[in-house]
Structure formats: C-alpha cells, structure tokens
C-alpha cells in the first residue's frame, strides 16, 4: 500500500487546470481500472489493488507508450537528486496574499469586455473594448505577493540525465510525491519519443516528459543514475 495516498497522488495534478482530467486523480476505465493522475507533463498510474481510498471514475485514452519496456533499468536515488537540487540558486517562494489569482475579476484576465448599445432605431450593437476596471491590462491593481518562507527553484532550472533534459521543478515534484508514498528511489525504465517511463514499485509507474532543449538562460545540474546490482 502507498503511504499518504491521497496527498501524494494529488501532487501529480493541477487543481486549477483547464481540463478536468488534470485536476484530480481518477479511476481510468480506459486503462483497466488503474488510477491515473496527471498534469500534462507528468503522470502516475497505479494498479487498483494498491489503492485504499475512493476516487471518481473517468475515461482518458493513454498516450501510445510501452509502459512495460525496460531497456535502461537505472536507479535514481532521491538523495542524489536532493544533492543536485541544492546546487541550484534557489529563490523565495511567493504566493498571492489573498489566495486569489492576479486576473481582473471583471474580464477574467482577458483585458476586454463587451459593450452593448441600442441606437435610436432600436438596433442593438456590440463591441469589445478595454475593460474599464483594469484599463485593458487584465490584471488586478490590488494584487500582492508575499513570501511563504520556502526557497524554491526558478523556472529556468533543468536536470540533465543521460542526454535527457528534465524540468527540475517537475522532477522535484515527482520526488516529493513518491517520498510521501514511502519510497527513496525510482527506476528509469525507458525513454520513448520525449517521454520517460519510471517504476516506483510493482504496480506503480510514472511518466515524465523531457524537454527539447535547456534554453539560453538556465541553470542545469547533471544527474548520474546507477545500474542496479545483478541479483
């Protein structure tokens, strides 16, 4: 069984995602009842026999990858990732003071609202114009960020591992989630068309998309996975 099951699995999702399938874990009827939790760049699949909690039902076609293929078979220890993580120049985490988005509530961040005008002959006319509340910026004037006390990775950090480039924040999110489940490493099974498949334990697999390039202004740290000893 997985420790801290609900909390750990939710870490693979985005509660404010634009697609419902990325908001919370669900039992995927298109995957033989396995649980799926994803946010678009990372995903976890869990066999139903390992689950203790209840989840909603859903249907989502899986990407066309072979989740059983194992042609890399290298162990990635979380202690090594943490050592690499600490080499980055971290920045203070900031969050909205009131917990709300910085989007203007009148125009939902678009910067435009629709005006209606009825002329002297009774005809109605519509026109999109700058929102009068935010002056077309789409942002709140009273939005304020405050530091949480945590130090986090900036957006431009990457891990490089055997030629694959990973968004460091996403890989670290996987580490934090899988640690909550009670594990201290994952096994890298395969890389397939930009996707990387990892095994947490029997019945639990993780998918993480790699990046095409590191970018011009970035920090990166090399990770060296290890080959497990032959039984």
Annotate each PLM feature.
Residues 1-231:
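DNA polymerase processivity clamps
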